[in-house]
Swiss-Prot record:
Record-given protein name: Soluble pyridine nucleotide transhydrogenase
Enzyme class: oxidoreductase
Catalytic activity: NAD(+) + NADPH = NADH + NADP(+)
Function: Conversion of NADPH, generated by peripheral catabolic pathways, to NADH, which can enter the respiratory chain for energy generation.
Similarity section: Belongs to the class-I pyridine nucleotide-disulfide oxidoreductase family.
Cited SUPFAM superfamilies: FAD/NAD(P)-binding domain, FAD/NAD-linked reductases, dimerisation (C-terminal) domain
Single GO term (MF): NAD(P)+ transhydrogenase (Si-specific) activity
Any one annotated GO CC term: cytosol
Compartments, as annotated in UniProt: Cytoplasm
Positions that bind FAD: 36-45
Source organism: Vibrio cholerae serotype O1 (strain ATCC 39315 / El Tor Inaba N16961)
Xref: NCBIfam families: PRK05249.1
Bilayer-crossing regions: none
Positions of disulphide bridges: none
Length: 466
């Protein structure tokens, strides 16, 4: 094999995890190649996941804002848009993101190889190009960052024109008046917000007893109420018995005996790691039943020189976490170990309408652990900035230790929640006595701002102490 086909590290997949690893390794002086099976970089995050869904959400939330503001919708006039119409906005954002990320690799002289990779042996991969040709490449180390795809149960016909998953929904060409979303996880709830915001009748089937049960209960309840108030029908503790595609829609038969009918179905219940085409057996690796790889604290698989990051290793399955994992692996490969361990308190951003974000522990976790905590709350309806913007739905909640005043968890529901949370996260991550709720009382905030919610919540919480 020619020297030009040998690299220090080969990264498989150009999503956030692969990008983080490749950029860190290249800047560290390593000769790096990144292999991408699609025709452009960015991975599922850019093309089917985070970027398009958030671009859709933004467009829908602006339409809702316009239609609910009497300053704009005079004489009962309102804006109406369809899903297929606002998809064009999402596609323009995808194009911008793709060009931006392509530039990263070009500027850093990271070799880009387009094609589907699979292992031949422990240090060699074959890449099948779009024209059918196959090239082989070798490396000292590998980083698997192939991401995940929607889970397809065998008894659901995803070839039917009215049955979609969270990838294929972005190719929706007809404009449904009624949609059933099966699966009320993060993806299902985000799309429920989008479709209901477009005035599409939305039924959300939840296989659990509450929405997003990993959240603080109050936040989960707030989302449930907001969905109910906006007209989303939630069916908790339900599982399908049969999904029947018809000529003009779909019928979902539930095991409880209920039947539901709509113009189309979005199946959003679970994801599978993209490992089945990698020929992992040739290197002595085996994925679990969900296609995911097991890694150690350094993100090494059972084969020491092969690492894995991002959705392909499962939890937390966040683009932000995947990027950090990739950077961590780059440090581990370059220096033998990473200088800093990744923080365990990863913020969660859920882009429903309104947004949800949290970091740290929930009330139910603290109660179960018998931690003496107190709660500070700020309602957005009491903030001048929220009143000005007409975004007064939501609240911020700070959980802190009664005795040390250490911040233990922050939970936010409302406009810009995913941005607001980082102010609290920055203080939470301080060491020792620097992590204190009193910081927000002793700091001057710009006025009027949404960030002021931290001061209001801190005062509210401290006033509860005795």
């Amino acid at each position: 094999m020619g020297q030009k086909n040998h690299f220090d590290v080969i990264v498989i997949g150009s999503g956030p995890g692969g990008e983080g690893a490749a950029m860190g390794l290249t800047k560290g002086g390593k000769n790096v190649a990144i292999i991408e099976k699609e025709s452009s970089v960015g991975g599922g995050c850019t093309h089917w996941g985070t970027i398009p869904s958030k671009a859709l959400r933004h467009a829908v939330s602006r339409i809702i804002e316009f239609n609910s503001n009497p300053l704009f919708c005079k004489n009962n006039s309102s804006i109406h848009a369809t899903f297929s119409t606002i998809l064009s906005h999402a596609k323009s954002v995808i194009d911008k993101q793709t060009r931006l990320r392509q530039g990263f690799y070009d500027r850093n002289q990271c070799t880009l190889i387009f094609g589907a990779a699979h292992f031949i042996d422990a240090h060699t991969v074959a890449v099948k190009k779009a024209d059918g040709s196959i090239d082989t490449y070798s490396a000292d180390k590998f980083v698997i960052a192939t991401g995940s795809r929607p889970y397809h149960p065998k008894d659901v016909d995803f070839g039917h024109p009215r049955i979609y998953d969270s990838d294929s929904i972005l190719n929706l060409e007809h404009d449904p008046r009624h949609i059933i979303i099966y699966g009320a996880g993060v993806i299902g709830c985000e799309y429920a917000s989008i479709f209901r915001g477009l005035d599409v009748k939305t039924d959300l089937i939840n296989t659990r007893d509450r929405l997003l049960s990993f959240l603080d209960n109050e936040v989960s309840d707030a989302l449930s109420y907001h969905f109910w108030n906006s007209g989303v029908v939630i069916r908790n503790d339900e599982t399908y018995d049969k999904v029947e595609g018809t000529s003009d829609g779909v019928i979902v038969h539930l095991k409880s005996g209920k039947k539901m009918r709509a113009d189309c179905l979005l199946y959003a219940n679970g994801r599978t790691g993209n490992t089945d085409k990698l020929n992992l057996e040739s290197v002595g690796l085996q994925a679990d039943s969900r296609g995911q790889l097991v890694v150690n604290a350094n993100y090494q698989t059972q084969v020491e020189h092969i690492y894995a990051v991002g959705d392909v290793i499962g939890y937390p399955s966040l683009a932000s976490a995947a990027y950090d994992q990739g950077r961590f692996v780059a440090q581990a490969i370059i220096h033998g170990q990473a200088a800093h361990l990744l923080t365990e308190d990863i913020p969660t951003g859920i882009y429903t309408i309104p947004e949800i974000s949290s970091v740290g522990r929930t009330e139910q976790e603290l109660t179960a652990a018998k931690v003496p905590y107190e709660v500070g709350r700020a309602s957005f309806k009491h903030l001048a900035r929220a009143q000005i913007a007409g975004k007064d739905i939501g609240s911020l909640k700070i959980l802190f230790h009664r005795e040390t005043k250490e911040i233990l968890g922050i939970h936010c529901f409302g406009e810009r929640a995913a941005e607001i949370i980082h102010i609290g996260q920055a203080i939470m991550e301080q060491k020792g006595e620097a992590n204190t709720i009193e910081y927000f009382v002793n700091t001057t905030f710009n006025y009027p701002t949404m960030a002021e919610a931290f001061r209001v919540a801190a005062l509210n919480g401290l006033n509860r102490l005795f």
